Amino acid sequence: MSEQVMVSVIMTTYNHERYIAHAIESVLRQQTDFRIEIVIGEDCSTDRTRAIAEDYAQQYPEAIRIVTSEENVGWRKNYRRTIAAARGKYIALLD
């Protein structure tokens, strides 16, 4: 897809194994006439959050990107780096 991303949906996560799939699916089901991307800031969860997010990113590489690091950076830095990775004209936060 070469058209510009209009909306970047920012999701920051830490140990959200129970909720992450539902949150991602809620964005993927949106019907729009513009391009949406999901940018997930995964902050070294100790559960399966990262694995679930990576599975979705593999299934939808044109729509989902994951921002990670080798160590937990905390919620504030996680938000900043995830927003910085956004390509959209507009940003939506999904907590």
PLM feature spans:
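Conserved short acidic donor-positioning loop in nucleotide-sugar-dependent glycosyltransferases
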Residues: 27, 43-44, 73
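Short aromatic/hydrophobic "clamp" motif used to bind/position activated sugar donors
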Residues: 91
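Active-site acidic Asp-centered loop
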Residues: 43, 94-95
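A conserved acidic beta->alpha catalytic loop
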Residues: 42-51
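Short, well-formed alpha-helical segments that are part of the catalytic scaffolds
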Residues: 16-29
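Cell-envelope/extracellular polymer assembly enzymes that use nucleotide-activated donors
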Residues: 6-8, 37
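Glycine-rich, basic loop-to-helix element that forms the pyrophosphate-binding segment
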Residues: 69-86
